[in-house]
C-alpha cells in the first residue's frame, strides 16, 4: 500500500529466516486491519476492496477490522466498498478514528451490527449526496443528473435507516443539511454501537 506525500514507517520482523521489512500498513494487514484514510476515491476504494477480498481468501471465518478516518467522497467508489463488505463472508467491524463524514459515515454505519465503534473524540457527519465539480450541458442533461441524484439520495437514506434502525423519514430530515455528531450522539443515533475509551473496553 502506498501513501503519497508522507513517509510510511517500516517495521522489521525477526524470523528463523532472518529479517523481513514491512511498511506499517502491510504489517497491520496481517492483523486483518484495513484503513480508509482521506477522501473516498476510485483509487482508495480499489485498495480497500482488494484488501477485503484478500483477507477473505486468507480466512473467511475471521473478522476484518476496517478503520475509517475520512471526509467522504465519491458515492460510486464508496458503494463499491459497501457492496464488498456485504459480499464477503467475514464480519467487517468498523471503527472511526478522527472523522467519518458523508460516505465515510455511511461506511461506518454499514459495519456488522454490534461491531461498529468510534474513539471518544471522533466526529461523524451525515448529509445528502452532493454534486462535485461544475455541472454543465443542456437543460435535459442537467435534469437527468438531478433525477439520478435524487435516486441516490433515496437509496443512501434507505440503507442508512436500515443500519441505524431508524425510520426513513428520520434520515430524510437529518441529512437535509450537514449534521455533525460527537461519538456519543452517533451512538444514540444508531450509527455506531460502542465508544472505545481503550482496548480493554472492546466488547465483540
From Swiss-Prot:
Compartments (UniProt record): Cytoplasm
Reaction catalysed by this enzyme: Hydrolysis of proteins to small peptides in the presence of ATP and magnesium. alpha-casein is the usual test substrate. In the absence of ATP, only oligopeptides shorter than five residues are hydrolyzed (such as succinyl-Leu-Tyr-|-NHMec, and Leu-Tyr-Leu-|-Tyr-Trp, in which cleavage of the -Tyr-|-Leu- and -Tyr-|-Trp bonds also occurs)
UniProt cross-references to PROSITE patterns, sorted A to Z: CLP_PROTEASE_HIS (PS00382), CLP_PROTEASE_SER (PS00381)
One GO molecular-function entry: ATPase binding
Active site: 102, 127
One GO process term, biological-process aspect: protein quality control for misfolded or incompletely synthesized proteins
One GO cellular component term: cytoplasm
UniProt keyword annotations, A-Z: Cytoplasm, Hydrolase, Protease, Serine protease
Listed EC numbers: 3.4.21.92
Family stated for the protein in its record: Belongs to the peptidase S14 family.
UniProt function note: Cleaves peptides in various proteins in a process that requires ATP hydrolysis. Has a chymotrypsin-like activity. Plays a major role in the degradation of misfolded proteins.
Record's protein name: ATP-dependent Clp protease proteolytic subunit
Organism field: Neisseria meningitidis serogroup B (strain ATCC BAA-335 / MC58)
Amino acid at each position: 500500500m502506498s501513501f503519497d506525500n508522507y513517509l510510511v514507517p517500516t517495521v522489521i520482523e525477526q524470523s528463523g529466516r532472518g529479517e523481513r521489512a514491512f511498511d506499517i500498513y502491510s504489517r497491520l494487514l496481517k492483523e486483518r486491519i484495513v484503513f480508509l484514510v482521506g477522501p473516498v476515491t476510485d483509487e482508495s476504494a480499489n485498495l480497500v476492496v482488494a484488501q477485503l477480498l484478500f483477507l477473505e481468501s486468507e480466512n473467511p471465518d475471521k473478522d476484518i477490522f476496517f478503520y475509517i478516518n475520512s471526509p467522504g467522497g465519491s458515492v460510486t467508489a464508496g458503494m463499491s466498498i459497501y457492496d464488498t463488505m456485504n459480499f464477503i463472508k467475514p464480519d467487517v467491524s468498523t471503527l472511526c478514528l478522527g472523522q467519518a463524514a458523508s460516505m465515510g459515515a455511511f461506511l461506518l454505519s454499514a459495519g456488522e451490527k454490534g461491531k461498529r465503534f468510534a474513539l471518544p473524540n471522533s466526529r461523524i457527519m451525515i448529509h445528502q449526496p452532493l454534486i462535485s465539480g461544475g455541472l454543465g450541458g443542456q437543460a435535459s442533461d442537467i435534469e437527468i443528473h438531478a433525477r439520478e441524484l435524487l435516486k441516490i439520495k433515496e437509496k443512501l437514506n434507505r440503507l442508512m435507516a436500515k443500519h441505524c434502525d431508524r425510520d426513513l423519514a428520520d434520515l430524510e430530515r437529518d441529512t437535509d443539511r450537514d449534521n455533525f455528531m460527537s461519538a456519543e450522539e452517533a451512538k444514540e443515533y444508531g450509527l455506531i454501537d460502542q465508544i472505545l475509551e481503550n482496548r480493554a473496553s472492546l466488547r465483540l
